[in-house]
A protein has these predicted regions:
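Short alpha-helical segments that sit at the start of domains
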Residues: 2-27
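Short capping segments at the starts of secondary-structure elements
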Residues: 21, 33-37
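Short, locally clustered residues in the helix-turn-helix/winged-helix DNA-binding domain
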Residues: 28-32, 46
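Short acidic, hydrophobic short linear motifs in intrinsically disordered regions
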Residues: 36-45
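Basic amphipathic alpha-helical segments that dock to polyanions
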Residues: 54-65
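Non-DNA-binding regulatory cores of transcription-related proteins
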Residues: 64-149
């Protein structure tokens, strides 16, 4: 964790910001966690960071490349970028809004690189979003009827 806090400090310093107690706390709350909503992060601060400060910190973290948004339908959750964790994608359940992490997959990465090459693009980053219904929601019929069902 100390190594990652040093990386956080270096990134913030390069971006013109200092490593405050509140910024360190938000980083620690996101470390080794599933993507979290802003509300969930706010609750986990136990009043140590007010809501306005949380939104400012997340905006700074996004601009500096420390965190990224993971979209779940039209809403989003926040997670640390690949600088701090292994590269992965998500499947989001439209029924219960659970996020399922897909660990790095060589086939997906190869396809993305092939598409970038085909379209003469140098890909610097990407996010793959898959939406559907998890096995629990399929079992409990929490998905809309699809044609053919």
């Amino acid at each position: 964790m100390e190594e990652k806090l040093q990386i956080l400090h270096d990134i913030l310093k390069r971006s013109g910001y200092s490593t405050t107690k509140a910024r360190r706390l938000i980083f620690q709350l996101l470390h080794d966690q599933e993507p979290q909503s802003m509300h969930a992060i706010y609750l986990r601060t136990n009043g140590e960071v007010d809501r306005a400060s949380l939104y400012r910190i997340i905006r700074i973290f996004e601009q500096a490349g420390i965190v990224q948004r993971v979209y779940v339908g039209w809403k989003y959750k926040i997670e640390l970028t690949d600088i701090f964790s292994h590269h992965h994608h998500h499947i989001s359940c439209l029924g219960c809004h659970k996020l399922i992490a897909i660990q790095e997959d060589e086939q997906i990465e190869k396809l993305i690189q092939e598409l970038a090459t085909k379209h003469q693009v140098i890909a610097t980053s990407h996010q793959l979003e898959v939406q559907g219904y998890c096995s629990d929601c399929q079992r409990t019929k929490q998905q809309p009827l699809l044609s053919g069902n």
